[in-house]
Design a protein with these regions (language model features):
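Loop-to-transmembrane helix entry/capping segments in MFS-fold secondary transporters
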Residues: 24-25, 108-120
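Hydrophobic core of transmembrane alpha-helices in multi-pass small-molecule transporters
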Residues: 80-96
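Residue-level signature of mid-helix packing/kink "hotspots" within the transmembrane helices
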Residues: 35-43, 128-129
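Intracellular juxtamembrane helix-capping segments at the cytosolic ends
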Residues: 95-108
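Helix-loop boundary and gating motifs at the non-cytosolic
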Residues: 1-35
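Structural signature of the two symmetry-related core transmembrane helices
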Residues: 57-71, 152
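Helix-to-loop junctions at the C-terminal end of transmembrane segments
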Residues: 41-54, 139
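A membrane-interface helix-boundary motif in multi-pass transporters
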Residues: 137-155
Length: 174
């Protein structure tokens, strides 16, 4: 669900950026900001959570932050606000992804690890591809506002599922 929500925007990000007055440099700055923030925060979060018992919970926390900042797209009216949303999304990504990767890796058997990682990586590409197509239809035939609402709702659903899974994982261990 999370990858579908994120994938809905995809390359439409550039069109949205132009609609709020952005140019090529603004689009570049916004996307670079997201990548740099998440790239710098990944190892920091990984280090902090390395021996934590909260790894699985952090997936839900990252998803919840992602939901907040996805809905924040609805409030964006200029490129400065867009940059702030990108920072928030980068932080959310850096909290949830290393935690998910560590949890996933802990559940793998050595005999299936390469295949399992292939599925984990391949499904994100496939889901994002389908989502981009759907997102394009929503943006073209309805609006970016509708697209951001759909993205936020799907992200919220992913967060709820992850919170439930976190709760089940914690209580199964007891």
């Amino acid at each position: 669900l999370w990858y579908f929500s994120e994938g809905l925007l995809g390359p439409l990000f550039a069109v949205f950026s132009e609609q709020i007055g952005g140019d090529v440099l603004d689009i570049t700055a916004a996307w670079a900001t997201y990548l740099i923030v998440s790239g710098l925060a990944y190892p920091l979060v990984g280090r902090v959570l390395n021996h934590s018992t909260w790894k699985f919970r952090m997936i839900a926390i990252g998803y919840a932050l992602n939901t907040v900042f996805t809905f924040a797209y609805l409030l964006v009216s200029n490129t400065t606000e867009l940059l702030l949303v990108q920072v928030g999304l980068g932080i959310a990504e850096s909290i949830s992804t290393p935690s998910w990767d560590a949890f996933f890796a802990s559940k793998l058997r050595d005999t299936d690890d390469t295949f399992a990682w292939g599925i984990a990586s391949g499904h994100t590409q496939f889901i994002s591809g389908v989502a981009i197509a759907v997102g394009g239809l929503i943006a073209e035939f309805v609006s970016f506002r509708a697209l951001f609402l759909v993205m936020g709702i799907i992200s919220l659903m992913a967060t709820i599922v992850q919170v439930r899974l976190s709760w089940m994982e914690e209580h199964a261990a007891v």
